[in-house]
Amino acid sequence: MAARSPSSSPPPPPVRRSSRRSLRVGRGAEVHAVRSEASGLAGAAREVVADKSDLLWRGEEGSGGRRGSGRAGAAVAPVASAPAGSWWPEGLSSEEAKATRSQLLEEELSSLKEELALCQADKEFVWSLWRRLQATNPDLTQTVSLVVEREKQKSEAKDRKVLEILQVKDSKIQELEQTESVLKQELHDLVKLKTLVDEENAFLRKELCDLQKKFKDKSQEVKDAKECVQSKEEQNRLVIKNLEEENERLRTRCTDLLNDLEKLRNQEAHWRKEKHSVDTRVKVLEENLIEAKKEIESAQTKYNVVSQQLNNKQAELLQKDMDITLIRKELQELQNVYKQNSAHTAQQADLIQQLQALNMDTQKVLRNQEDVHTAESMSYQKLYNELHMCFETTKSNEVMLRQSVVNLQGQLFQKEQENVKLKEKLEESQGTAPSLSPHDSDSSHSGKAPLSTLETLMISQKSEIEYLQKKLKVANEKLMANRSCDQDFSEKGTEGKHKEPPVKRSRSLSPKSSFMGSEELRKLKKAERKIENLEKTLQLKSQENDELRDAHEKRKERLQMLHTNYRAVKEQLKQWEEDSGMAESRQMKRAEPHQLRQEDSDAVWNELAYFKRENQELMVQKMTLQDELDELKMHMSIDKTTIQELNRCMAEKREEQLFRQHEDAEVKKSTPEKNEKAISEETLQKVIELENRLKSFEKNSRKLKEESKRLKKENDFLKSHLKHYQEDSEAREKELEQLLRVSKDVEHDKSELQTKITALETEVTTLRRQVTEAKALRGKDEEVVCPEERAHRPTDKAKSEMATTDVRARRCDCKTATTKVKFKAAKRKCSVGRHHTVLNHSIKVMSHVENLSKDGWEDVSEGSSDSETQTFQNLGTIIVETSQNISPIEDGRNQKEIDQTEGSCAQQRAMQTYSCEDIKAPQSISHNKNTKKMTFQKKSGSLQKSLHSALPARVNREKCKNLPAQKSSSSTISLRERIVSLQQQNSLLQNARRAAEASAKEYKEANEKLLHQQQVSDHRFQTSRQTIKKLTLDLAELRKEKEDLLKKVESSSDIMSLAEEVSRIMAPQIKVTTLGPSRSMDLEMKQLQCKLKNATNELTKQSSNVKSLRMELLAKDDHIKEMHERTSRMERDITMKRHLIEDLKFRQKVNSESNESFNEMLETLEKKVKSLTEECSNKKVSVDSLKQRLNVAVKEKSQYEQMYQKTKEELEKKDLKMSVLISKLNDTETAMAQIETAASEQLQGLALQSEQVLEGAQKKLLSANEKIEEFTVFVKALVNELQSDVHGTRHQIRELKKMQKSRHACKTSTHKAQTLAASILNISRSDLEEILDTEDELEIEKTKIDIENDKEWMLYIQKLLEGQLPFASYLLEAVLEKIKENKKLTEGYFTVMKDTK
């Protein structure tokens, strides 16, 4: 139905531009809607026919009419199910669509109303039938006739509706045939339109091809234009480069020519000045040399003294730093000890509170027991008279029992001695073989640590504390001495700096005084600044030391307080340990939620204690975190001080450099007119200073680069290590969380097992009680088996038989021998038992320090009646083992002497009555857990120690940084120390990682042990199940025996009644025999008296037995009454169920009878149905023929619809293609216009940009060329000066040599002739000497070689300057070579001067 409704029809085509096209589309849509409605009606007709056939078979239900009407309604209004605005065609307006939709909805409402009326009529008819059937004698024939009539009416109405629907469908078929003819005409029209559209598409495709060709041509033109622009730009760039190179060459030539002119002029001036200033310069240099030697010697002596003092003080400071690091390590160890002690004291305080609460509970229980005891003593006094007769019989039994008790006590004492010996052996084996397996070691550590070892540990701790105090005193004294030395050294340094004379006196005399004064002032200011900075640093460090001392003193006081508290708690614990023996240690059980609902219960108090403990642990953690924060703050402050000092040093260096540059500038300005000697000396000194500075800068830069590389590598290495450690720590935390989860699951399973075991134990104890009661009854019934035989026997034999029966009863269950005497007393002491259970419950809640499984209870005796009252051990033993659990955490710390208090002794003596056997399995488990705690705490302590040891190393490193760096190597020393400290930290972190891995392994081992223990507990649970099954079988047997005993008791009561009758008969016989002779009477009387005595004795015995049996019978009667009540309840339930079953059977009979009547009705209805089916088959044949016609019409319709849809889709596609092509054409035209405009704009913009870039490049080139020219001028001037200096020195050396020669060959006649010749020729004397003097050939060759070398050097420098860019290193090497030559020449010059003198 849904497939044929208009909602599933394909969507209408889009609106065309032409009106003819829209009208055709509208008509097609209308026709499509009419066809879909016709198909919907046809489907409805088919379904009505199917419904009719179904209704004939389902006439009993009365719902076929409703189903058929509902489907017909759905067929009438198929459009109503479609969504709003999606089903009407495009030709209709929205208002018309709304009107049609409202009409359809009204039709649906009317159909629904008709259906509702039919449903109500059916309902009323069904209710009327139900009322008739519920009558006492219903007329089934009338009801059946009514139903048949009702169904006939329904079938007639349905037939009418079917005929109406068929008529409607015939009319619609005719309409559809008319629409088919219309559609065929439209298809012909569409085919014609298709041909027209194809022609239009071909024309448009041709146009598209033409446009694409035009577009390609224009794109090629744009590319060609771009390539032309790029080629022009490249040509412009090449032209600009060539012009720049030519400019540079011309400038270099101009500068060279200018430099040559300046050099020539300078040489002339230089030669003239040198001739006049050589003599004066030599004298000044000699004086300066003498003074410089004296000053250097004095400076060296001072320098040696100061260096020795510095070395001594550095060594002392290093020793102090080492002492401080050791003290810090010791302090951190003391802090760890303090933390452990604080945790231990907190645990002990909790224990003391628990013990006090237990004290109060025990006192209350003891008072209650005293009250009960007084009441019981009164009852015992009343029963004393009754039990006096039974005393003789029970005396023998008591003697035997006492002997057995003594034997058992001896056995227990022997076992305890054996246990003590075994423990001693285990301790010895632990000392000799520490490499035992973990399971054996855990089982062997159940004993407590000896007192001697703890006392030795306390003594060693005291000695360590005294040693640390002495070290602190020594360190304080050294610090005070260092302060005084530093102050003396700073004063001496200031005096020395004030007295230092100036070294440099090689400058001219005019600016010397001002320059020397400025240098002295600068040095004084520098010294004052250094002194102030050092004083500030000293004050800061003294403050830090004072703060550290205060902190150490406070921690020391806390330690002492903790030691006192620890001793007091240890003494109290030792008292408990001495009073009680060895006992098991158990963990506090967490209370369940249902136990916390009571306000004043033990569970609530235990939960409060647990939360208090956790709060204390969190407080301890908070304190540790605060300490770590304080340490980090201290490190931050130290880092800040180091950063400030480094910044200060950098600022000082910068100031020195600026001051030196300023001084050089002032000196240049102050001496514009110098002599030739002063200028040469200054140039030499400048060159020397520049060389030294260059070398120092190079060395420092290399060192700094190397150090920076090393530091970067170390930082990267440390970062990788840190990441690795962080990942490891995260993995370990995850593993720990998983282990904790597993342990929690295991504990949860254990708690569940414990609850199950306790329930089983209670069942076992009840079964054992019943068994012991049955056995006691059996033993007492055996005494009453044959009373006639016992009446003839003497009293001694009766007593022996009673003893033997008691012994047999004892041998039935060997393990319960000690408790059978207390059987009757236990029944009377129910109130005392209750008080015991209260006390044991409180002990259970407060003593479970470890969560232990109760598997060990299987080893306890099976038939003990006191097992419920003595399930838990002595209070003193529990307290001892809780102290043992705490003592391993301390690792055998100090234990002191312990005083015994009377209250605790009394309490322990009172509680020792409730002690039972020691349990081994839980003890081993508790020791395992204690060892785990020990290992975990040791590892955490080692981690803390490692971290704390890393912190002093860091402090030491940063203190070493704070030392004033007076040499250039101080920075390298500090970096090396930092590297060493980082390596130490790395090693410590590696150790911590190994410790964590070991702890994880131990946790895994502990988990495996817990799993093994769980398996053991499961095995024990299975064995307990088996024992329970055995006990149930024993119970069944005992119940049978009980029934037999009851029968015997009844027979014994009959025998007692016969004995009473015999005594009554004997009394009249005695009266009758009194008339006889006296002798026979006396004899008979004596015999009768003896018999009576025997009978009375037996009667008293039997009466006492009967009384006990009566008491037991009363108890059994109570039990039987309870069972009778249960049975009566069960019988009532059974009777109620029987009544229900009878009612159900009666109803079943009634229903069967009604079913028979209904079956008869069904047979009649089936006959009618057969006749109707035959009619329906005939109708079906006619309907099938109509269906075939409809199918043929529908197929043709579907074919035409497909053809129509295909043509529509093709037209839509072509329209879309046309629209897309038109849009593309428009886009291409707009794009072409845009491209042309953009190309023109881009070309203009590129031209402007190229102009701007060229202008900027020209400016940059000009500035760069100017800089390069200035640099080349500077280099050439420097080179010329160097070369002129070399020439000058060589010329001076030659003149000196000539002076030597002239002195040797000096004559008055030659001298006069030379003067005359000079005056005649107008030549100076030196020129004349040059003319006259003929030099040696070797010297001439040397001078030529030197000149050639100088020219080659100049050409090499010019090539470097004109060559490619990386030429700085080569230029520097060439200049350094020339400077070295100048140095050598100056040294030769000075040697020649000395020789001339």
Curated annotation (Swiss-Prot):
Interacts with CEP250 and CEP68. Interacts with NEK2; the interaction leads to phosphorylation of CNTLN. The modification N-acetylalanine is found at A2. Required for centrosome cohesion and recruitment of CEP68 to centrosomes. The modification Phosphoserine is found at S5, S9, S22, S1219. Phosphorylated directly or indirectly by NEK2. PANTHER family: CENTLEIN (PTHR18957:SF0). One of its GO terms (cellular component) is centriole. The lineage of its organism: Eukaryota, Metazoa, Chordata, Craniata, Vertebrata. The modification Phosphothreonine is found at T1334. GO terms for molecular function: protein domain specific binding; protein kinase binding; protein-macromolecule adaptor activity. It comes from the Eukaryota. Keywords: Acetylation, Coiled coil, Cytoplasm, Cytoskeleton, Phosphoprotein. It is found in: Cytoplasm, Cytoskeleton, Microtubule organizing center, Centrosome, Centriole. InterPro entries: CNTLN (IPR038810). Residues 1-43, 56-76, 422-449, 485-521 are annotated as: Disordered. The keyword Iron-sulfur does not apply. Residues 485-503 have a biased composition (Basic and acidic residues). This is Centlein. GO terms for biological process: centriole-centriole cohesion; protein localization; protein localization to organelle; protein-containing complex assembly; regulation of protein localization; single fertilization; spermatogenesis. Residues 95-126, 405-481, 674-778, 973-1114, 1152-1299 form a coiled coil.
